[in-house]
Amino acid sequence: MVNKFRLTNSTPVATPMVTGTTFSTADSLSTPTPVACMCRIPYVEVIGSVLWPVIVSWPDAASAVSILSQFMQNPRPAHWEALKHVIVYLGSTKDLWLTFSSQSKLTAEGFCNANWGGQKYCHSISCYLFHMGARAILWSLKKQHVVALTSTKAEYNVQTHVAKEGLWLCSFLQELHSTPDDPLIINCNNQGVITLAKDNKFHMHTKHIDMCYHFIHEVVEDGKIMVQYIPTGNNVSNIFTKPLAKAKFQELAELLGLHTITHKV
C-alpha cells in the first residue's frame, strides 16, 4: 500500500494517528469540488485492506482504523489524510512483530476500558483485550449500541462483554487441557465499576442500567471472574481509547507484546 499510494518518500511516523485528532460524524462535504475529489479516492478499499490485518495481527493500529472506518459512507479529505498517515505508520513499523514465547504460560488475563465522549459522537467505544503470557491474543473495539449517560455505565457495559468473551476463552483453554485454577482476572481502572460488579451497592443510583448488564455481577459472585483495579497508566487497553503521544503509545505497544525484529539476509 505504501508503494501503491506513492508514500515511499513520506517521513516515518511513530504513531498511527496524531495526538489529539478528533472527528465528528456530523462532518460533511459542503462544496462540489471536494465531493468530486473524494469520489476518486479509494477510501473504502483502503479501509478494507487494513481492517482484517488490524483484527488479527496489528492491535497497535486498531484504534485509528476503527475511528476512520466510521466515515466510509462520506469521507472528507481530512479522513483520507489520516488514513494515509496510518499506511505510513504501518510501513514505518514493518519490523514490529507480535511475538510469542514457547515458554509462555497458558494463563489468560483481561483488560478493559471505554472511550466515553472521547470523539465527537454520542456512543461510547468499548475497548478490551486479553493477554496470554504477557502477549495480546484477542482484542476488540466496538461502538456501544446505547448512549451511556456516565463513564461508569460505559465501562460497566464493557465489563459485561469482556466477561462473556473471557468465559469463552476459559472454555477454549479447557479444551486444550489447560484448566486455570484461579478465576479469570479482568483489569479495570474505574473503582466505581469494580465496586458495582462486586456488590451492586449503588443499586438506587444505577437502576437505569439494564439488568442484562448485571451478568458480570453474577459471574463475579460465582468466582469465575475476578475484577481488579489497575492504574490508568498501566491499563494496556488505553492504547485503544484515543490517539496517544509517542512515548505512552510505545510503552503500551510493548505491553501488547510488540517487539522489533530485524531479519538478516
Predicted feature residues:
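Long, low-complexity, charge-biased intrinsically disordered regions
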Residues: 1-265
